[in-house]
Amino acid sequence: MARQYADIYLRGLDEGCIAALVGYGYRLACVENLSNEFAEKARRLGLTVIRKRVFNPSSRSELLRSLHEINEVCVSVKPLSREALMTALRDRRVDTVILHGGIAEVDRHILQVWENAVELSVSELVECAGNVKGLRTLIAYCRKAVENEVPVAVSSGAASAAEILPPQQLAYVLAALTDLEAPVLNAVSTTPVTILRKDRK
């Protein structure tokens, strides 16, 4: 059976994005600001699109309040505090925890509660370009995830068609950060596809 590819984070969707995704061979995409019009256009071209909600909580209580609002969407959390991170990593309503330059440093306490998949977005990686400490922390999470066989999804985080990357290129991003020679194809196929196909009712 042919491998299915998914980009689990786009910030918007238009005709250019749809053309790029289909052209690169994606079968699924997850979009933060999604209109029904473009979702239908994508469907007609064989691309399944799912809505994404991204929460940026500063505390555990803020995250828990936000999670009451979810309804048949993919839920990603970009935690802005250690407390919010610890909650996001173990709450089963969270589909992915987005890694970013300001995330709390990984330690044994975080490893003890870490159950959910993490998401490495190229857009977040680019933002870390001038933040050496943040980049090191992000790389440490990627390596711990691979080491402990925690699911990792790599996404583009694209806001336009020009920022969408081929799935193999996304897979090489994770490989480069974790010193692996081969692209980590599961990060753009099995892991995000499993997340996006799950029953959300």
Could you tell me what each predicted segment is?
Residues 1-31, 36-52, 57-65, 70, ...:
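Charged catalytic cores and adjacent phosphate/nucleic-acid-binding surfaces used
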